[in-house]
């Protein structure tokens, strides 16, 4: 039940789950801002299946939406916000009082947990499946309805409140890929607590720095994380982090995983999850202001203070709900799978909050693309659960291809409900893209975004009629709200197909970060000082004549070869397109004549019989044909594996340091740190 005083004040969308029937008059947040922008589709909202079904793929609807989002963002996002339920209407849709940060839906009050769970139950969807938990590492499969999720989340919210957590307090979540991690996120959102979810298994030193920075009253953890072939003991890692650091939380809530030994509790500090839940009282949703932080998510950063991205509640809810239909083309009720980790922004946005806000079924997968048990794992999950759309990283596809080049394991599964494969997290080379299309037999769409934005910056907006067969190598067009431009270092706009700095003209749309936790100076300096009036993505790329954006590399990964700026990503793309190399990373090696020359670290495909010398000769010739002699590419070192972060990114700065014989730091997000030693050894032998 909601507090009674709120019931008559709740503003609900037209056409969304929980809204009045199409044709009824929706309540208004700020009347002028909420007038209908375009003729609504069959569900009365922006985008969605109705728009997609009528689309010819010409993108005319996309063009209308993008233009409206740029010329009149207040009206555009005001309309989208009607699909979210509000306790109190906003007085102003957009405000730039604290530039460069933009405030959205000023003075509006809402609750994300209510929008993600309660409202679906109130509108007769309580028995629909909210979460499918698929854990090959524990041989467990389970489903949870929206009603069952609400029961767990509301009780857990009661546990947190009982132990002193109130609106505005911080909670650190340090858990594996289990439903209880999502329950904790939602329980925090329910009571207005700010969660900071940190990868389960994260090293104690890094965990300690984040605990010291966010100063949680409570840490929520689990007894073990399960990796292929091993268990990770979480509680000793937490204990070590607390010894290293200064801050001590009041309580540690521990979930003991079933069928494993229980961990001992520290008297007076530790709480047993099951015992607390057994005696818990359910807790209602607490309204929060639109700008209230929903979570703090730490991202890779520079030296100094950790870089904790602050996510504002209202704009995030609006953007995620809108994106599920307009970008990803899903109807409520369809099954969605973001094959990521909850610790990444993809996990926050598109395992937990996005699909639940939109009334979808979300797959929570505790496994890997290969090795749990084999390269057919993704195909099994897609077939077994009737997944409509999958979101994964190109590195996962490359891993599957390397293990099973012909996808023999995948071909045994029928993917009748599977419609679209979205990839992001790193550049998707054309070779991987084409292989994916041939194997999965669905459109494969690359798109691009960042932890800071919380949702895509560029994409093929399926729900708005964008082409499902865009040119190879692109990452989509500017998502409505993101006015993307390519500038040189002097802030001059570049012509089509000229490599430059990718920036976004302000204001940033709803859902983008509102700051860095306890570090607003860095927020302004890092993102907004170099190009005043723009958000600096710190990525390099270009835009073609049709508006497709090609993200080539981080600005730092542009290699200066004798005065020519060469994208490392372009060379990688060329190498991978040859077909003999399964994975590669290109870095700049210092050269006394040219300044830098590109060096490739390559992983050969398993089915290649040629010698390394033959392959090197071939790929050098191939790069020369594709990019030209200006790239000065002549050298490659062959390794058995490349180091990757858990989200599939290659740590190029560390590899560049190794190649140039300089000290380097192994960050705690690296999946297997031992690979660095292997790379060093191969470089010595080369």
Swiss-Prot record:
Residues 1-29 form a transit peptide. The keyword ATP-binding applies. The modification N6-succinyllysine is found at residue 518. One of its GO terms (cellular component) is mitochondrial matrix. One of its GO terms (biological process) is lipid metabolic process. Disulfide bonds: none annotated. It is found in: Mitochondrion matrix. Transmembrane segments: none annotated. GO terms for molecular function: acetate-CoA ligase activity; ATP binding; medium-chain fatty acid-CoA ligase activity; propionate-CoA ligase activity. Pfam families: ACAS_N, AMP-binding, AMP-binding_C. InterPro entries: ACAS_N (IPR032387), AMP-bd_C (IPR025110), AMP-bd_C_sf (IPR045851), AMP-binding_CS (IPR020845), AMP-dep_synth/lig_dom (IPR000873), ANL_N_sf (IPR042099). The modification N6-acetyllysine is found at residue 524. Keywords: Acetylation, ATP-binding, Ligase, Lipid metabolism, Mitochondrion, Nucleotide-binding, Transit peptide. Belongs to the ATP-dependent AMP-binding enzyme family. This is Acyl-CoA synthetase short-chain family member 3, mitochondrial. It comes from Pongo abelii.
